[in-house]
Amino acid sequence: MKLIIYWTKEAMHKPSDGSPRMYDRIVKRFGFSDYISINGETPVDVKEIDLPDLKVAEERGYIQIRNK
């Protein structure tokens, strides 16, 4: 399923404890490209099985899922 992910400030924030940004963790978990457009969006291809986990990240405020 092709989607557009918009990255929020919360995902891009670097924690003070030295742990990776949530952006880095999401990119690694789902195998997304590290490309981000000037508008803060990344085009992605998500497997149906991974969609519920991606929705959890959206509910926590790290991303917005956009259908374009």
Question: What are the functions of these language-model segments?
Answer:
Residues 44-68:
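Short, mixed-charge low-complexity intrinsically disordered segments
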